[in-house]
């Protein structure tokens, strides 16, 4: 475990959580039970998605990103659907690269929209974000407010974290 962390890799311990590299302390541990956040993106936006993954993890969330979580030999369509279904939030990263592109990104969005049908209407599940000045698909834009991560990345991330935390607080209050 230590060697992997020193090499800059995260190490997931089933049933417990994830050890992650940390520049200040060497590593940090994220226990299971943290709110799960699925990140959907196109491969051209992988660097931005990885930055968002890091920001969410640093804020105490457990992000899910295919490049970080899929295992060799794993059935990736099934793993992705399971991850979306188990997530507390689904962040769709739209950009000029994703506009009109066919493939896995679109399938993930469609599956998330199906999952959202099972969630109470006033709960937030899908959080669309724009990585650049692109068009958000009409079906999404007509129903769900998006957040811009440009030109001020930090401000956009703070807005995402704020809305997710308010939702989690509301869900906890509703259970008690």
Walk through the language-model features, giving the residues of each.
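Output/docking surface of receiver
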Residues: 143-160
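Conserved N-terminal substructure of TIR/SEFIR domains
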Residues: 34-93, 97, 113, 117-125, ...
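Extended, charge-enriched "interface" segments that sit outside catalytic cores
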Residues: 129
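Glycine-rich, charge-decorated loop segments at or immediately adjacent to ligand/cofactor-binding or catalytic sites
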Residues: 133-144
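Strongly charged
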Residues: 1-35
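Short, polar/flexible loop-turn hinges at active-site or ligand-entry regions and domain interfaces
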Residues: 99-100, 119, 147-151
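Glycine/threonine-rich flexible loop motifs
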Residues: 100-107
């Amino acid at each position: 475990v230590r060697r992997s962390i020193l090499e800059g890799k995260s190490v997931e311990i089933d049933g417990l959580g994830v050890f992650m590299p940390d520049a200040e302390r060497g590593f940090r541990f994220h226990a299971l039970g943290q709110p799960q956040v699925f990140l959907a993106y196109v491969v051209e936006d992988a660097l931005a998605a990885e930055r968002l993954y890091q920001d969410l993890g640093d804020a105490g969330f457990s992000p899910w990103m295919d490049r970080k979580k899929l295992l060799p030999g794993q059935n990736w369509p099934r793993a992705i659907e399971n991850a979306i279904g188990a997530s507390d939030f689904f962040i769709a990263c739209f950009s000029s690269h994703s506009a009109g592109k066919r493939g896995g990104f679109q399938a993930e969005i469609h599956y998330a929209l199906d999952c959202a049908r099972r969630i109470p209407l006033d709960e937030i599940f899908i959080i669309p974000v724009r990585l650049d000045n692109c068009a958000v698909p009409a079906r999404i834009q007509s129903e769900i407010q998006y957040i811009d991560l440009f030109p001020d990345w930090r401000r956009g991330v703070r807005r995402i974290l704020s809305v997710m935390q308010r939702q989690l607080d509301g869900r906890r209050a509703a259970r008690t």
